[in-house]
């Protein structure tokens, strides 16, 4: 069986590029923008590096550029992270602004670190600390809150918010694992007998 993003279990990710390849240039993401949209893009990029697939790396870069357009907004203090809200976004539809979820900041941060874009990763992390649409901190002495509603922070403090915050913070401090330089990875795989 094939998963929703085209990769069959145990395939080593060989099917990952297919839905991205079939996506239209104006909407290079396979499907609507829902939750954790940066994760498949990061997976495609990691697959491209690990198996020396230039097409996968290029498709991942194209999809990440598309996500940047929809997830980062210029503001008075510079760029801020502004994820798609929980009503999701289909092509040709307006972006739902709320309820923004912590998982989005964490996933964007990890992807941008993986792509070597630390500044954007830091901007995504600052979403938790008030660099967001409402300039409302989502973390205080009691921990992170569950999201950003039109009226301010969702005061619930669930495990997802806590884990998203801690994993994002850890990645900023320690970096993503494994740390792979794109040029070195592509050359190393080739040297080990990978296909050009």
Residue locations for each model-derived region?
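Glycan-recognition and catalytic cores of secretory/periplasmic carbohydrate-active enzymes
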Residues: 1-196
């Amino acid at each position: 069986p094939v998963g929703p993003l085209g990769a069959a279990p145990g395939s080593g990710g060989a099917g990952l590029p297919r839905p991205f390849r079939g996506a239209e240039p104006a909407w290079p993401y396979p499907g609507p923008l829902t939750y954790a949209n940066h994760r498949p893009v990061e997976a495609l990029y990691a697959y491209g590096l690990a198996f020396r697939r230039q097409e996968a790396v290029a498709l991942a870069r194209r999809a990440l550029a598309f996500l940047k357009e929809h997830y980062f907004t210029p503001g008075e203090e510079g760029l801020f992270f502004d994820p798609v809200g929980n009503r999701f976004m289909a092509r040709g539809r307006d972006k739902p602004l709320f309820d923004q979820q912590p998982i989005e900041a964490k996933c964007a941060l990890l992807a941008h670190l993986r792509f070597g874009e630390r500044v954007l990763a830091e901007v995504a992390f600052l979403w938790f600390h008030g660099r967001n649409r409402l300039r409302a901190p989502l973390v205080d002495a009691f921990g992170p809150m569950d999201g950003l509603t039109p009226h301010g922070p969702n005061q619930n403090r669930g495990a997802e918010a806590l884990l998203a915050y801690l994993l994002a913070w850890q990645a900023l401090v320690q970096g993503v694992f494994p740390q792979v330089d794109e040029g070195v990875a592509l050359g190393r795989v080739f040297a080990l007998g990978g296909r050009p």
